[in-house]
Amino acid sequence: MKVTLIAILTCAAVLVLHTTAAEELEESQLMEVGMPDTELAAVDEERLFECSFSCEIEKEGDKPCKKKKCKGGWKCKFNMCVKV
């Protein structure tokens, strides 16, 4: 009976440690070192391409690029769609 109890407690401890390590790894992968929250957090590849392509087409000589309104909380900035 003691062996069973020890085995159950050991498995529980391993599970807790594994879960904690997995959460820490996930958090470290989400955070960029030295990058403030106000900077670009995420870029959607499709919207980035659409916005850059649209800005290049609309550019006329020395005039600045006309900003295409990106949808869904995105805006066009420096020929890229950035999350607002």
Curated annotation (Swiss-Prot):
List all disulphide bridges recorded for this chain.
51-65, 55-76, 70-81
InterPro entries, alphabetically? Hwtx-2-like (IPR012625)
Q: Name one GO molecular function term.
A: toxin activity
Tissue expression pattern: Expressed by the venom gland.
Coiled-coil zones: none
Q: What is its main location?
A: secreted
Q: Which residues form the signal peptide?
A: 1-22
Propeptide positions: the record gives: 23-48
Sorted alphabetically, the keyword list is:
Disulfide bond, Neurotoxin, Postsynaptic neurotoxin, Secreted, Signal, Toxin
Per the record, its GO cellular-component terms are: extracellular region; host cell postsynaptic membrane
- State its location(s): Secreted
What job does this protein perform?
Blocks neuromuscular transmission. Acts cooperatively to potentiate the activity of huwentoxin-I. Paralyzes locusts and kills mice following intracerebroventricular injection.
Family from the record: Belongs to the neurotoxin 12 (Hwtx-2) family. 02 (Hwtx-2) subfamily.
Protein name per Swiss-Prot or TrEMBL: U1-theraphotoxin-Hs1a
Q: Which organism is it from?
A: Cyriopagopus schmidti
